Amino acid sequence: DVYKRQLHNRCRLQWKKWFGCRGLQFGRCILLDKELRLRLNSGSRVTLGDRVESDGRMSITTGYSSQLNIGSGVYFNDGAVISCLGKITIGEHTLFGPGVRIFDNNHRFSREEGVSRECTAGCITVGRSCWIASDVVLLKGTDIGDNCVIGAGCVIRGKVPAGSLVTRSGEQTTRPIETR
């Protein structure tokens, strides 16, 4: 029932704001699934626009002084993961397929010392009215313009111009979206 879901989310998010992340702001009619896992650092700033929705399991983790901005009308399908240690901005009316993973951070590593538990953070921007299909991975340094489609299974890092369709079949290709 939608009303119960909205009430549950308002109570849960208000609780997080009072006792954890004072930088949490959220709009009206938040429809997040009960299986949402929120790990918000007290020093982070998190903004959820109106009618942000998730179906099924989802995980959101923020680090100290990180910024996560999710616009109004954004939808996340089952299994989405957001790890924000730097800055992630998602434009309004963007849709995410199942299993999408968004990481604005990466472990430090070197040939001499191997992998460290320390992380480096960057930025990710996803424009308005995009469709990010199933099992896409967005890495730090990603900048996706408005009205883009990112095909299933793509790993994205770097700039994707507005109005682009990105697909993967052996090699990743980027081309303008054709009007049909």
Residue ranges and their predicted role:
Residues 10-23:
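An amphipathic, basic-hydrophobic alpha-helix
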Residues 31:
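Conserved short histidine dyad/triad with adjacent acidic residue
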Residues 158:
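Short helix N-cap motif at coil->helix boundaries in the Bergerat
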Residues 2-3:
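Short, small-residue-biased leader/transition segments that mark boundaries at the very start
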Residues 36-142, 169-180:
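Flexible, glycine/small-residue-enriched loop-and-beta-strand segment within the central core
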